[in-house]
Amino acid sequence: LAAPTASVALQDAPVVYAGLWRRVAASILDSLITTVAVYLIVIPLVFVVALVTTRGDWGSALDAGSALGIAILVMSCGIVLAIPTLYFAWMQSSRHQASLGKLACGIKLVRADSHGGRVGFWRNVLRYLAYKLISVLTLGIGVIVAAFMAGMTERKQAPHDKVCDTLVVDRWAFTEYPERQSRGLDTVSIVVLAIYAVIQVLSVVAVAFMLAAIGMSRS
């Protein structure tokens, strides 16, 4: 549930900004949610292409399949961008002011200049697109810069936060209960980060074993 809003006087209480690791944990959860949503849409499209290309005359089917395949590829790229954009814009402009990942990790998104006010739908769209654009134009370096700024700057603002004048804060910031804010990692964030770390380690070990097995089979 969304934390209650506060009177103007209480909104002037100290604010706890969400640090790097809480944001990373929330991002992991949100990535899982949006990835599943994308697959649920894209996979049926792939089956449609396969169905079309295996019907009728092989020559015309291949031609139609090639054209449709290109169309599906373009549509898939659009879906991969549109799903998370709409997801974040809808959730973070709602009364919760947070995506599902942020809700789970006890943080929310607010306007930097409005004492905890909501970030509008289109500003959320711009914020996500700014994040993706910065990441693409810098060949991924923007992600590292965003992580550094989210962890080290005074108000924990990443570049896309500065562009859109937003803050990521504890869910109890700018409410009637500012004393409930937490500066450390919450339980959900710790569990998510721990599981993610274990998965990464196991992935590295699995790849190492596969490479070793391939090397042994060739020798």
Describe every region a protein language model picked out.
Residues 1-10:
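Intrinsically disordered, low-complexity Pro/Gly-rich regions
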Residues 14-25, 31, 87-103, 118, ...:
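Juxtamembrane cytosolic face of transmembrane helices
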Residues 14-53, 77-97, 212-216:
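Cytosolic-side membrane-entry/anchor segment at the start of a transmembrane helix
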Residues 38-81, 189-219:
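Membrane-helix interface segments in multi-pass membrane proteins
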